[in-house]
Amino acid sequence: VLLLAFCAAAMLTVQAQPTVTNSWTKSQTDILSVANVNNSNPVAVSAQGDMYATGLFTESFTFGGKEIEAVATSSYLLKYGTDGAEKWGVALTGAATIKTITTDGAGNVYIAGNFADELTFGSTDGNTQVKEGIKMDGTPIADQAAGFVAKYDVNGVLKAVQSFVSKPLPELEATGIYFPEAGDYRFDINNIAYSDGKLYASASYKGLTENNGFSFKGGYFDLDGGGFWYGDLVSGAVFYLNDQLEVDGILANMGVTGGKSTDLSSVQSVSFAVAEGKLYSGFVASGKQTLTIGSKEQAFDLSQENGVTEYGHILSIIDLADGSSSLTKKYSTTHDAYGNYCFIKSMLVKGDVLLLGGTFNAKLAFDQNIDAVSTNDLYVAVLNKNTLDVNNAVASKVNEGDANSKKEEFGGMTVCGDYVYMIGHTAVIASHAVETPLTFWIDTTNGTMTQANPANLATGVAASGTKLAIAQTQVADQKLENIFSLNEVSNATGISSTEQGAGVSVYPNPVVDVLNFTTPCDVVIINLIGVTVKQAENVSSLPVSDLISGQYIIKLTTEDGTSTAKVIKK
């Protein structure tokens, strides 16, 4: 038995991080001044293996044999083939920033972001479309406060585009003492994802934004109830769009209870993930907030006492068949009201886990034993997608320097096998100037983190299957270079096995009391140092409540062969 255990252990290897092999690398140089860099280049990989890249540019350039022309600080969308060949490029001509990108199974690409003034959406067939942004007193504002979403087909033909142009809340205008400045009312789409024939999006917003009969209404404050100072408060929503990219339904929204507050409490961030007929929403908020999902409203009274504010991280599971919520769970952390950095920036589903990524200060809401170093830290939390219980969580633990002047900024994350690849950087708070690039590999099966030391700043990341797309920037001789690469990822299993063939599934995972097996089998449970801690023959279930918490290897044998599985005992 001991020999069997050690032989099994020898075939099981813990990977510190996957192996990444570059397939190709391309770059664009000197099309944007160093002063205009925004440290964000959202990228995507299609199911066909093509890579889409985005960014800002102020100088015209040639791509795929055609000139991409700039007006002011425009945005570009580029398509590279599986071999890195330049397929096509289009410009969003005017003042625009692409914030998020995704693809569908047919290779269509969707982009969303913000714009100002007049924006022309390019198209490879020459049929462009123009959208106008927010105006104040009849004059376009310079702030990129209007939102947009656009769809392009595999050949770069513009198929649909929608703008989201906010206006003042009628309640605020009625006060007679509301004097908004540019950007006080706005619509910011921060994430889009395509699933089962629909495009989903999340947005934060202030003021009133209307589209296709649906209204997104921010909150407002009457400070201390004195009737002398009014202003806008941020609300958030997760919604879906039809083929014309019009709003077709709002799945979840959160805003200040009653639409009005006497303090500055608001929604801090909103994100979501969608998979297998379920949507997982995530809001971070403070003060008195109401979450609405379908016809159900749930109020949250987040504490604000003695200068300490509670920041609720509110997660829900929504059944897309009927729009109802089966579960909502709140995780919280508290800190003084100055300088909040508690945000859920990204959510992904991988197998049975829900992955959350973002930043936090003080204590991490998903693990109160984790404290931020200096100003704030990046984090990844791994949750059971069915119960929203936390499996494990990790933080960057980087000391960025003076808490009054430096911080860490989250750049994005994606999933490769059992690993999350997270990017970010340290920056100067006042200017957002980058100081140190940060990249991490996180093994979701056990919560271990490996920090890399990249030479360049990673500004975008996405994966599809074993293909990993990375955008980077570097500055040399006062010239900015955007670098795009497609890479092949291997050895992406946290604990890999050479044995295959039994075809037995193990559940639940994580487990508390009893492990179940879909087929009767011989079972050997091995800890991570190779010692057999439990075994049984021809069983469909096995009690494990006596095992200590941690990760185990389950060796499963049937007449069809032997395989292994990873299980977390809680």
Regions found by a protein language model. Give the residues of each.
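Generic alpha-helix initiation/capping and coil-helix boundary signal
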Residues: 2-3, 9, 240, 317, ...
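Short, functionally important structural connectors and interaction interfaces within domains
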Residues: 4-6, 49, 107, 144, ...
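The N-terminal extracellular segments of secreted preproproteins, especially immediately downstream
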Residues: 5-6, 341, 415, 520
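A sequence-level/structural motif corresponding to short, flexible coil/turn segments enriched
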Residues: 16-494
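Bacterial Sec-dependent N-terminal signal peptides
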Residues: 1-21
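C-terminal outer-membrane/trafficking sorting elements
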Residues: 496-507, 511-570
